């Protein structure tokens, strides 16, 4: 399946166009972008901001800390830092303070024991942020689409309602890429989010506002969604934890756009947080009845796990080469697991991984059980009503008149070219099924796979336009339908986060979550921005 000469020429032209657009974007950034005295926010000085969600909930239940003090500490941090990172795009501070006061009042009036409180409200009083694509009652729900700028959520998305029911207090909603289909979080309504480790770098997408908000200690737990890496890339670029659950476990209802048909299975809603110990409790709440499909209470003996690893995709001509920093960091993990933990570690070469992008496109090209074609992106741009001409929007964009971002215009222009014919779909569907079987057989119920999160650390703004296919390092596991936990592994020499994906077989999420906690203890986990 070597790429044809025509395919190589098309790729070259696409990258050349992306490079030119990137130059325009960088020039705009230099000439008219926001200026800050520092390239990172100030380090955290408030101790309450350095506690996990579980720790905060325990202190609040024990009445050792007032909920209103916790919420106020986060509001103060947001006011100080958010103007730099633009992670939270709409606050609900007044409502949050009222809800915090109600928690304190409830604890003062009712003398329920700690165990009862934990069982009823495991996240009692814990600050929460929510990706803007999810419905949070009374808040905007546009997904960065100008046509939906006046859309206000009348109800809560299912996962938001579950977390609120568990006691969490939403502070606001966070930025995303337009229609959640690009890996830089920027749109015409809210603007662009910036990486707290270096404001000139991206936060990832589409849950990028959530990633930078958590990394900058403006929140402690958050909600994201992932159909190609939209939880994992922001978690990686911002040095936090994120989990893409096994498909079908966590309800997706109440987000826009909501995947339908064959794609519905691949859209996964999941937790994002700074501390690994919050992942499993969040997942238990967010999954609702679906949690029965997982084994989160099963004790994991890490030494008995089988670890497999691969340092790159095998040489796809579409993707960038993996940075040496990331390869060396992965090897440090491998050496530690083998020599210190004493686990079984094996290097593997899965040859079909080099077709990662093609497998993701095949997933997005799949027809539903009713035979219907997938929803067209250009129809989403028009919010299923307004006709949108991608070519005309490109001309308008060049004149500074379009209400759409260039990645969205580009995708609308190219989607018919990208969408596979039935013959091509069947070819790559067979590859996907073969690779999935190979991985599932290899992993069994006691194996995990370590794989790069992305070929590079967080790139500078606009650079993704020149490397549009690099997301496939995460996208492939969406196509394969496997659970993945994104884990931070410190910072590189320039102060940007390093990390790794930990993959398991279907419904073995408990394995990747256990490995995440171990890696956090061993390699330090989240690093506060501004301390580098």
UniProtKB/Swiss-Prot annotation:
Tissue range of expression? Expressed in kidney, liver, lung, prostate, heart and ovary.
Q: What is this protein called?
A: Fatty-acid amide hydrolase 2
Q: Which SUPFAM superfamilies match?
A: Amidase signature (AS) enzymes
Gene3D superfamilies per record: Amidase signature (AS) domain
**Organism source for this protein?**
Homo sapiens
* Family membership: Belongs to the amidase family.
Q: Which GO terms describe its molecular function?
A: fatty acid amide hydrolase activity
Q: What InterPro entries does this protein map onto?
A: Amidase_CS, Amidase_dom, AS_sf, FAAH2
Name its cellular compartments: Membrane; Lipid droplet
EC number(s) recorded for this UniProt protein: 3.5.1.99
């Amino acid at each position: 399946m070597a790429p044809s000469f025509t395919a190589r020429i098309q790729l070259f032209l696409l990258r050349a166009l992306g490079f030119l657009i990137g130059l325009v974007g960088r020039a705009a950034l230099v000439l008219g972008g926001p200026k800050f005295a520092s390239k990172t926010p100030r380090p955290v000085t408030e101790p309450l901001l350095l506690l996990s969600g579980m720790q905060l909930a325990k202190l609040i239940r024990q009445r050792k800390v007032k909920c209103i003090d916790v919420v106020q500490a986060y509001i103060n941090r947001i006011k100080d830092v958010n103007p730099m990172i633009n992670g939270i795009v709409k606050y609900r501070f007044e409502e949050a303070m009222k809800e915090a006061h109600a928690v304190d009042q409830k604890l003062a009036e009712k003398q329920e024991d700690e165990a009862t409180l934990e069982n009823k409200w495991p996240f009692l009083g814990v600050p929460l942020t929510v990706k803007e694509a999810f419905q949070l009652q009374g808040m905007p729900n546009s997904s960065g689409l100008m046509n939906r700028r006046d859309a206000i959520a009348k109800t809560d998305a299912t996962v938001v309602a579950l977390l609120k029911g568990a006691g969490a207090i939403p502070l606001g909603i966070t930025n995303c890429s337009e229609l959640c289909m690009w890996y830089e979080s920027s749109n015409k309504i809210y603007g662009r989010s910036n990486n707290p480790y270096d404001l000139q770098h991206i936060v990832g997408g589409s849950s990028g506002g959530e990633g930078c908000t958590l990394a900058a200690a403006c929140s402690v737990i958050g909600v994201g969604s992932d159909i190609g890496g939209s939880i994992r890339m922001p978690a990686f670029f911002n040095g936090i934890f994120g989990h893409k659950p096994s498909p079908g476990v966590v309800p997706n209802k109440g987000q826009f756009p909501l995947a339908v048909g064959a794609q519905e299975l691949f859209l996964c809603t999941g937790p994002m947080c700074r501390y690994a110990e919050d992942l499993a409790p969040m997942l238990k709440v967010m999954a609702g009845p679906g949690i029965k499909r997982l084994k989160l209470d099963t004790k994991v003996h890490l030494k008995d796990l089988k670890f497999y690893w691969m340092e790159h995709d095998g040489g796809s001509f579409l993707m960038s080469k993996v940075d040496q920093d990331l390869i060396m960091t992965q090897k440090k993990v491998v050496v530690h697991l083998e020599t210190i933990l004493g686990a079984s570690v094996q290097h593997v070469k899965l040859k079909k991984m080099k077709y990662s992008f093609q497998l993701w496109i095949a997933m997005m090209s799949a027809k539903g059980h009713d035979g219907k074609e997938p929803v067209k992106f250009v129809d989403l741009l028009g919010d299923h009503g307004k006709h949108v001409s991608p070519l005309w929007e490109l001309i308008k964009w060049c004149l500074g008149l379009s209400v759409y971002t260039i990645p969205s215009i580009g995708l609308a222009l190219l989607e018919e070219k990208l969408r596979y014919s039935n013959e091509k779909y069947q070819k790559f569907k067979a590859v996907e099924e073969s690779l999935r079987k190979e991985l599932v057989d290899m992993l069994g119920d006691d194996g995990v796979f370590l794989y790069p999160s992305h070929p590079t650390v967080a790139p500078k703004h606009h650079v993704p336009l020149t490397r549009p296919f690099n997301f496939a390092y995460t996208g492939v596991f969406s196509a394969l339908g496997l659970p993945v936990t994104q884990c931070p592994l410190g910072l590189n020499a320039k102060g940007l986060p390093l990390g790794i994906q930990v993959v398991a077989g279907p419904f073995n999420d408990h394995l990747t979550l256990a490995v995440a906690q171990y890696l956090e203890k061993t390699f330090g986990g989240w690093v506060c921005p501004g301390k580098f």
